[in-house]
Curated annotation (Swiss-Prot):
Gene3D superfamilies: 1.10.287.1490, 1.20.58.850, 3.40.1140.10, Immunoglobulin FC, subunit C (1.20.5.420), MukB, hinge domain (3.30.70.3500). It comes from Escherichia coli O1:K1 / APEC. Belongs to the SMC family. MukB subfamily. One of its GO terms (biological process) is chromosome segregation. Homodimerization via its hinge domain. Binds to DNA via its C-terminal region. Interacts, and probably forms a ternary complex, with MukE and MukF via its C-terminal region. The complex formation is stimulated by calcium or magnesium. Interacts with tubulin-related protein FtsZ. It is found in: Cytoplasm, Nucleoid. The lineage of its organism: Bacteria, Pseudomonadati, Pseudomonadota, Gammaproteobacteria, Enterobacterales. Plays a central role in chromosome condensation, segregation and cell cycle progression. Functions as a homodimer, which is essential for chromosome partition. Involved in negative DNA supercoiling in vivo, and by this means organize and compact chromosomes. May achieve or facilitate chromosome segregation by condensation DNA from both sides of a centrally located replisome during cell division. GO terms for molecular function: ATP binding; DNA binding. Keywords: ATP-binding, Cell cycle, Cell division, Chromosome partition, Coiled coil, Cytoplasm, DNA condensation, DNA-binding, Nucleotide-binding. This is Chromosome partition protein MukB. ATP binds at G34, G35, N36, G37, A38, G39, K40, S41. GO terms for cellular component: cytoplasm; nucleoid.
Length: 1486
């Protein structure tokens, strides 16, 4: 017996309260005991998470955080985990004794949604000695361990030999491995399967009768019969396709005329547009070539005009440049004339101002002398007045002192003090600190001598100063003149510079006298130089136009050569005109012949098309009209023979059909009356009894019974006698055989078997010899073999009949085509090809056009050469008179030389004009510069110094005189002499004082008078100086302006400037006249160029548009041609006769066909859309697509193997024959495919019975289950009343509803849904379609109702409902149903998985305290009998007697929670045995 797989242990790593805990699972029941919050639900949650790691399903509702939002994805799992990496692992042993560890790595994801990240994995090949906790933890020390991340776990396992580690990216792959290894009972292919599995676990976990399970028990227990549904769907699809084909055939048959009309109009519509585009393409090509030729011609003309324009523009630019230069020269000459006139006026002003300045200079010098004399006299008067003042002051002082002395004569001390004061003042003034009264007299003489010396020196300096002032005035005048001419210089260099300036002045005056002769000479040479430059320009222009450089000596010979060329070209132009006329005449004749041939070509092409069609249809070549008439006679004879053979084949085909219909009768009866007689007599046809005879025995039994093989076997012949009376509706020979139809044998005859024959001894005197038939018909196998061979023969006959019919119709159509050809085209069909002649004439026309073009080019070149020769002669006529100037090479050098000399002379003239007066004034007084007189300023300073010295000496002498005079005061011995002496002195002093005051008054009067006169002199001098300075400044400004003007104003300058201006004005007028002529010619040339440019631009635009149109049309045309060739419709569309119609005619033809097509395809959406798209004139390929779509539309309705001609009408006629055969075949096929409603009912009933039996077998496993008052549990399966009525109607009363099942508009599913609605009108079907309802009715599961029943106490069998059962009874009932579901899954999965493996079987039960001891014991018995593992979570009051119990206690140690776990095995009377490894495990790790 196969051992069932088991779960060995559950391992929790880093869960809330469990750091590294492994729970060893009992083979039957594992109990988790503990109080509230001990960790029981957490342990079960870890198991469920490892079993179904789907976050969309997991929901531990009893521990979901309060207040969690609906958007939270926690579902109670996030709070059971601790931070970091967490694991939940299941250690299993399957039926093959393979250890498999499956589990998940969990980790909290930071965020408000409290998400959890889950990664499933599996480990295979792990040794039994390795514990799960050792894999995922790493011991750091005695009290600390670390949880390994998943990547480190992978690396650790890969390092272990023989161990396989698999990490899964999808839950489906994870469950697939668990199913293959026998860990779970069902393959969970989808989220729906996982949801069912989770709902089962959830129902087990929370106990009771789960409404989610009981409501969907059909989905859990009844397998889907997808094969039956697919068979029905395939049948319906085949019927639908068959009916659609039949409908299409009927539509095709009804649309035959429409197809003919569609083909005709589509051909006209597309072919007309196709040929119009072909014609337009040819026309566009011709136009593009014509535009290109005109474009090349216009470009050549434009190039010639541009060359001409460039030459004239160059000449005009030269004239414009020359005009600019001339205008500039003329303006410069005018400006020069104005400047000369201005300079002359300025020169006159300068001369007037210079005369005024000379006069003012003289007056200023005279006034300076007057002022100087007045200043000297003023100084003398000031000195006398000052001396008089001093003298008066001294006398007054002396007189005052003396009076004071007289007043204080008695006071000697005052006098003595005055004497001492005088002595001190004398010491100070005389700078004699050792002066005494005794030595004062001596020093007085000394200082008086010094005063006399100072006075003499002052007088001497005054005389020198008067003499030096005159010399200084002449030197300064000469020095200022030199400075004015030469610029600043040292005074000692004035003499040398003045002599050099005088010599230079002589030379400059000599050069200035040569200005006028040089100017006249230069004007003459410049005129010749301009003429020479003009001749050189003309020669260069001539050489440029000729494209060759010529020497001066060659010009006369070239002139004669050009005149000869002009005469020759004139003759050539006249001859070319006659040749051009002849070519144009021939061209017009060719064009007329081509037009006549183009009118005849369409008729010939139509005849040729008809003739080619006839040749293709009959496979003959016709060279004359006689061949056509002879072949028509042969065609009539062939038509008669084909009609006779077709009628014979048709008769044989009808005979075969009748025989097939006869042999196809049920029971092998060839006569329907025999079936009715057999039913009437209560017998059975002999053929029905032997219906199962093999094909090998069929000849024997056919010969054995002979004519009686159609007999009726009846139980008693005597009972048939009464029915034979008056029997008329029967075969001529009716055989009746008595016997039991259930045990009939062939012992009624005496038979001798021969070679391929039998001898039947009917009676002693009657034998029958029957040979074995070659084609036996006795028995179903023989009939089917014969029918098969008849069908094969019928196929051959049908094909032959179709072929003959097609040949007859083809021959008839061919006869009609020949008749139409003879009547319409025979007269012109065998004439010569006009298109070939048109091609030859077009080739000749192209040659003529090319000859004309070449002739025009040659003629144009000759005209150009003629014009060039004329221009060359004109240019030479202007150059030849100036050859002598061209030969003068030194003219420019002479001009430059004279211009340099003139510049020097003009510079000298400007120098003389500017400094001539200064030089004239300098020349008489230049000698005073030889020696520089004493410095006048120094002399003035010395004079002033001597005056000061004389004044100081006078004061010193006066001071000493006073001391000497007061010397008596130093002695008091002789007072009487002093008084008498003082009286005389007083008188003298008074006299002197009066004289001094009188002198002072006179000096003051003289000083005031002379000061007034000096003031007048100074005012006059200031006025003269101001006038002089003003005129000098104006003169300097005029001279600067004259220098700025830059011209030398002499007597002939104005005349020369005026002559130069007039010459330039004449040249400018001539240049403007030529420029105007060139501008007019250039304007005309530009107008011609503009016209040519516009024409060229228009030609370019037309050409490029046409070229682009040609290129675009070429691309589109290539696509059209490719599409035409790929689809093989070129022959139909390329109708050459349409090429000679105009575009309007073709467009009209296409538009008329388009209107007809719109009506023809109005009901066909595809063709209507394609036709609408084809109306785009820019997309001609879409018309081809429409034509191809029309053909494709026909091909979809005509079998490809019967389209034997390109003529659509012939194909449709042939299709008529084939469609009739197809209709018959499809009708018979539909009858074979159609399944009867009785068969459907039987299939569904058989399926329901099979599943009821399976549920009954499952119920047997629950018969012994009892708990509480529940004696037994079962699952009741019943057929719904409405569906049972449907099955009855389908099997018994289906004939009443054949309107539904025989309708071609309804599928079988829809008919079934309509029948269901007809039988149950009270049921609301909602928004579901009949097809959906019908598909549901084809699923047998919808016919069944399932409910759980319990046998409870005295109530008997009741429906299991939570309200009618106690809590424990409900849990037990639910557990029983879950076990049934698991059992059903295992049975179903044995077909998918090997039968040598038995999966693990484990359920949960939380809060088991609701069960009593008997119920718990019942669960233990159930687990033991079903080999099922059970995990129970219960409070501490549960003490099972069997299994393994874990006691969980949650403790808090140092703010850290951990669960204390103690495991016990069983509860025997002896002391409980502590399980190994059940000590408290540390729950914290660093």
């Amino acid at each position: 017996m196969i051992e069932r797989g088991k779960f060995r242990s559950l391992t929790l790593i880093n869960w809330n309260g469990f750091f590294a805990r492994t729970f060893d699972l009992d083979e039957l029941v594992t109990t988790l005991s503990g109080g509230n919050g001990a960790g029981k639900s957490t342990t079960m949650a870890a198991f469920v998470t490892a079993l179904i790691p789907d976050l969309t399903l997991l929901h531990f509702r009893n521990t979901t955080e309060a207040g969690a939002t609906s958007g939270s994805r926690d579902k109670g799992l996030h709070g059971k985990l601790k931070a970091g990496v967490c694991y939940s692992m299941l250690d299993t042993i399957n039926s093959h004794h393979q250890r498999v560890v499956v589990g998940v790595r969990l980790q909290q994801v930071a965020g408000r949604d409290r998400k959890v990240d889950i990664k499933p994995f599996a480990i295979q090949g792990l040794p039994m000695s390795v514990q799960p906790t050792q894999l995922v933890t790493e011991t750091l020390n005695e009290r600390q361990a670390r949880v390994l991340p998943l990547n480190e776990l992978k690396d650790k396992l890969e390092a272990m030999e023989g161990v396989q580690f698999k990490q899964f990216n999808s839950i489906t792959d994870y469950h697939s491995l668990m199913f293959d290894l026998g860990i779970i009972a069902r393959r969970l292919r989808s989220a729906s399967d996982r949801s069912k599995f989770y709902r089962l676990i959830e129902a087990s976990l929370y106990g009771g009768i789960s409404s989610a399970i009981t409501r969907s028990l059909r989905d859990y227990l009844l397998p889907e019969n997808s094969g039956v549904r697919k068979a029905f769907q395939d049948m319906e699809a085949a019927l639908r396709e068959n009916r659609m084909t039949l409908e299409a055939i009927r539509v095709t048959q009804s649309d035959r005329d429409l197809f003919k009309h569609l083909i005709s109009e589509a051909t006209n519509y597309v072919a007309a547009d196709y040929m119009r585009h072909a014609n337009e393409r040819r026309v566009h090509l011709d136009k593009a070539l014509e535009f290109r030729r005109e474009l090349h011609t216009s470009r050549k003309q434009l190039a010639a005009e541009q060359y001409k324009h460039v030459d004239m523009a160059r000449e005009l630019a030269e004239h414009n440049g020359a005009e600019g230069d001339l205008e500039a020269d003329y303006q410069a000459a005018s400006d020069h004339l104005n400047l000369v006139q201005t300079a002359l006026r300025q020169q006159e002003k300068i001369e007037r101002y210079e005369a005024d300045l000379d006069e003012l200079q003289i007056r200023l010098e005279e006034q300076n002398e007057v002022v100087a004399e007045a200043i000297e006299r003023q100084e003398e008067n000031e000195a006398r007045a000052e001396a008089a003042e001093l003298e008066v002051d001294e006398l007054k002082s002396q007189l005052a002192d003396y009076q004071q002395a007289l007043d204080v004569q008695q006071t000697r001390a005052i006098q003595y003090n005055q004497a001492i004061a005088a002595l001190n003042r004398a010491k100070e003034l005389c700078h004699l600190p050792d002066l005494t009264a005794d030595s004062a007299a001596e020093w007085l003489e000394t200082f008086q001598a010094k005063e006399l010396e100072a006075t003499e020196k002052m007088l001497s300096l005054e005389q020198k100063m008067s003499m030096a002032q005159t010399a200084h005035s002449q030197f300064e005048q000469a020095y200022q003149l030199v400075v004015a001419i030469n610029g600043p210089l040292a005074r000692n260099e004035a003499w040398d510079v003045a002599r050099e300036l005088l010599r230079e002045g002589v030379d400059q005056r000599h050069l200035a006298e040569q200005v006028q002769p040089l100017r006249m000479r230069l004007s003459e040479l410049e005129q010749r130089l301009r003429e020479q430059q003009e001749a050189e320009r003309l020669l260069a222009d001539f050489c440029k136009r000729q494209g060759k450089n010529f020497d001066i000596d060659e010009l006369e010979a070239l002139h004669q050569e050009l005149e000869a060329r002009i005469a020759s070209l004139s003759d050539s132009v006249s001859n070319a005109r006659e040749e051009r006329m002849a070519l144009r005449q021939e061209q017009e004749q060719l064009q007329s012949r081509i037009q006549s041939l183009m009118q005849r070509a369409p008729v010939w092409l139509a005849a040729q098309n008809s003739l080619n069609q006839l040749s293709e249809q009959c496979g003959e070549e016709f060279t004359s009209s006689q061949d056509v008439t002879e072949f028509l006679q042969q065609l009539l004879e062939r038509e008669r023979e084909a009609i006779v053979e077709r009628d014979e084949v048709g008769a044989r085909k009808n005979a075969v059909d009748e025989e097939i219909e006869r042999l196809s009768q049920p029971g092998g009866s060839e006569d329907q009356r025999l079936n009715a007689l057999a039913e009437r007599f209560g017998g059975v046809l002999l053929s029905e009894i032997y219906d199962d005879v093999s094909l090998e025995d069929a000849p024997y039994f056919s010969a054995l019974y002979g004519p009686s093989r159609h007999a009726i076997v009846v139980p008693d012949l005597s009972q048939v006698t009464e029915h034979l009376e008056g029997l008329t509706d029967c075969p001529e020979d009716l055989y009746l055989i008595e016997g039991d139809p259930q045990s009939f044998d062939d012992s009624v005859f005496s038979v001798d078997e021969l070679e391929k024959a039998v001898v039947v001894k009917i009676a002693d005197r009657q034998w029958r010899y029957s040979r074995f038939p070659e084609v036996p018909l006795f028995g179903r196998a023989a009939r089917e073999s014969r029918i098969e061979s008849l069908h094969a023969e019928r196929e051959v006959l049908s094909e032959r009949f179709a072929t003959l019919s097609f040949d007859v119709q083809k021959t008839q159509r061919l006869h009609q085509a020949f008749s139409r050809f003879i009547g319409s085209h025979l007269a012109v069909a065998f004439e010569s090809d006009p298109e070939a002649e048109i091609r030859q004439l077009n080739s000749r026309r192209v040659e003529l056009e090319r000859a004309l073009s070449n002739h025009e080019n040659d003629n144009q070149q000759q005209r150009i050469q003629f014009e060039q020769a004329k221009e060359g002669v004109t240019a030479l006529n202007r150059i030849l008179p100036r050859l002598n100037l061209l030969a003068d090479d030194s003219l420019a050098d002479r001009v430059d030389e004279i211009r340099e000399r003139l510049d020097e002379a003009q510079e000298a003239a400007r120098f003389v004009q500017q400094f001539g007066n200064q030089l004239a004034k300098l020349e008489p007084i230049v000698s005073v510069l030889q020696s520089d007189p004493e410095q006048f300023e120094q002399l003035k300073e010395d004079y002033a110094y001597s005056q000061q010295m004389q004044r100081d000496a006078r004061q010193q002498a006066f001071a000493l005189t006073e001391v000497v005079q007061r010397r008596a005061h130093f002695s008091y011995s002789d007072s009487a002499e002093m008084l008498s002496g003082n009286s005389d002195l007083n008188e003298k002093l008074r006299e002197r004082l009066e004289q001094a005051e009188a002198e002072r008054t006179r000096a003051r009067e003289a000083l005031r008078g002379h000061a007034a006169q000096l003031n007048q002199y100074n005012q006059v001098l200031a006025s003269l100086k101001s006038s002089y300075d003003t005129k000098k400044e104006l003169l300097n400004d005029l001279q600067r302006e004259l220098q700025d003007i830059g011209v030398r104003a002499d007597s002939g300058a104005e005349e020369r400037a005026r002559i130069r201006r007039d010459e330039l004005h004449a040249q400018l007028s001539n240049n403007r006249s030529r420029r105007n002529q060139l501008e007019k010619a250039l304007t005309f040339c530009e107008a011609e160029m503009d016209n040519l440019t516009r024409k060229l631009r228009k030609l370019e635009r037309d050409y490029f548009e046409m070229r682009e149109q040609v290129v675009t049309a070429k691309a589109g045309w290539c696509a059209v041609m490719r599409m035409v060739k790929d689809n093989g419709v070129e022959r139909r569309l390329h109708r050459r006769e349409l090429a000679y119609l105009s575009a309007d005619d073709l467009r009209s033809m296409s538009d008329k066909a388009l209107g007809a097509l719109r009506l023809a395809v109005a009901d066909n959406e595809h063709l209507r859309d394609v036709l609408r798209m084809s109306e785009d004139p820019k997309r001609p390929e879409r018309k081809i697509q429409f034509f191809v779509a029309v053909y494709q539309h026909l091909r979809e309705r005509i079998r490809q193997d019967i389209i034997r001609t390109d003529d659509p009408v012939e194909a449709i006629e042939q299709m008529e024959i084939e469609l009739s055969r197809l209709t018959e075949e499809l009708t018979s096929r539909e009858q074979k495919l159609a399944i009867s409603s009785r068969s459907v009912a039987n299939i569904i009933r058989k399926t329901i019975q099979r599943e009821q039996n399976r549920i009954r077998m499952l119920n047997q496993g629950l018969q012994n289950v009892s708990f509480g008052q529940v004696n037994s549990v079962r699952l009741n399966v019943n057929v719904r009343e409405t569906h049972a009525m449907l099955l009855d109607v389908l099997s018994e009363q289906h004939e009443q509803h054949q309107d539904l099942f025989n309708s071609n508009r309804l599928t079988f599913s829809e008919a079934l849904a309509k029948l269901y609605q007809r039988l149950n009108p009270q049921i609301d079907m909602g928004q579901r379609t009949p097809q959906t309802i019908g598909e549901e009715l084809l699923d047998y599961r919808n016919y069944l109702e399932m409910e759980v029943e319990v046998n409870r106490g005295s109530d008997g069998w009741l429906r299991a409902e939570s309200g009618a059962l106690s809590t424990g009874e409900a849990i037990g009932t639910g557990m029983s149903i879950l076990v049934m579901v698991v059992q059903s899954w295992e049975d179903e999965s044995r077909r998918l998985r090997g039968k040598d493996i038995s999966p693990c079987r484990l359920l949960f039960l939380d809060e088991a305290a609701r069960l009593d001891a008997r119920s718990i014991a019942t669960l233990f018995e159930l687990c033991e009998r079903l080999q099922m593992q059970l995990i129970i979570a219960a409070p501490e009051n549960i003490s099972p007697e069997k299994g393994t119990t874990y006691k969980l206690v949650r403790k808090v140690f140092q703010n850290t929670e951990h669960v204390h776990v103690v495991g016990l095995r069983g509860f025997a009377p002896q002391l409980p045995e502590t399980l190994p490894g059940s000590d408290e495990a540390p729950s914290q790790a660093s």
